[in-house]
């Protein structure tokens, strides 16, 4: 199952090693999202940057909405059903299914690997962006509930 990783906190006061990890994850700005496979290497990177990001397993429907609404090609061109069919030879639904099941990596497609999202409508959780999701905040692992956050941000 692929992870959706969203950067929540900014760059002020970030240690150098964590800043490098966020760069390797391609999370240069707040509210940027990447889809990564569930591998040991990426899990280590996520664990290191857990105080600046939130992550969880993305579902197919949310990924389809993200690709169609926020996905971009080179030159900042928008994506639609016909474009994906023409470039990839498959529908958006098939592409999303393969990305979620880690058969294809998003970076191996012509789609840009970073989704630039809005801040969440109605805000983050009540405890804010400095506390873990388990205690009511916005940071760290949130499992399947990442889809709720992404739907607020699309």
UniProtKB/Swiss-Prot annotation:
GO terms for molecular function: RNA binding; structural constituent of ribosome. InterPro entries: Ribo_uL30_ferredoxin-like_sf (IPR036919), Ribosomal_uL30 (IPR039699), Ribosomal_uL30_arc (IPR005997), Ribosomal_uL30_CS (IPR018038), Ribosomal_uL30_euk_arc (IPR035808), Ribosomal_uL30_ferredoxin-like (IPR016082). Part of the 50S ribosomal subunit. This is Large ribosomal subunit protein uL30. One of its GO terms (biological process) is maturation of LSU-rRNA from tricistronic rRNA transcript (SSU-rRNA, 5.8S rRNA, LSU-rRNA). It comes from the Archaea. Belongs to the universal ribosomal protein uL30 family. One of its GO terms (cellular component) is cytosolic large ribosomal subunit. The keyword Ribosomal protein applies. The keyword Ribosomal protein applies. It comes from Methanococcus aeolicus (strain ATCC BAA-1280 / DSM 17508 / OCM 812 / Nankai-3). Keywords: Ribonucleoprotein, Ribosomal protein.
């Amino acid at each position: 199952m692929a992870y959706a990783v969203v950067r929540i906190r900014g760059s002020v006061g970030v240690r150098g090693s964590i800043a490098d990890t966020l760069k390797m994850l391609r999370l240069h700005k707040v509210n940027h999202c990447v889809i990564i496979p569930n591998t040991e290497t990426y899990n280590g990177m996520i664990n290191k940057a857990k105080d600046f990001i939130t992550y969880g397993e993305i579902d197919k429907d949310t990924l389809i909405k993200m690709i169609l609404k926020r996905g971009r090609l080179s030159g900042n061109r928008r994506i639609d059903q016909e474009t994906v069919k023409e470039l990839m030879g498959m529908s958006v639904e098939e592409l999303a299914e393969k990305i979620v099941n880690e058969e294809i990596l998003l970076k191996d497609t012509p789609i840009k690997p970073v989704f630039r999202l809005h801040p969440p409508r109605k805000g983050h959780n009540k405890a804010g962006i400095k506390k873990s999701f388990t205690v009511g905040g916005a940071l760290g692992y949130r499992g399947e509930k990442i889809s709720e956050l992404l739907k607020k941000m699309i």
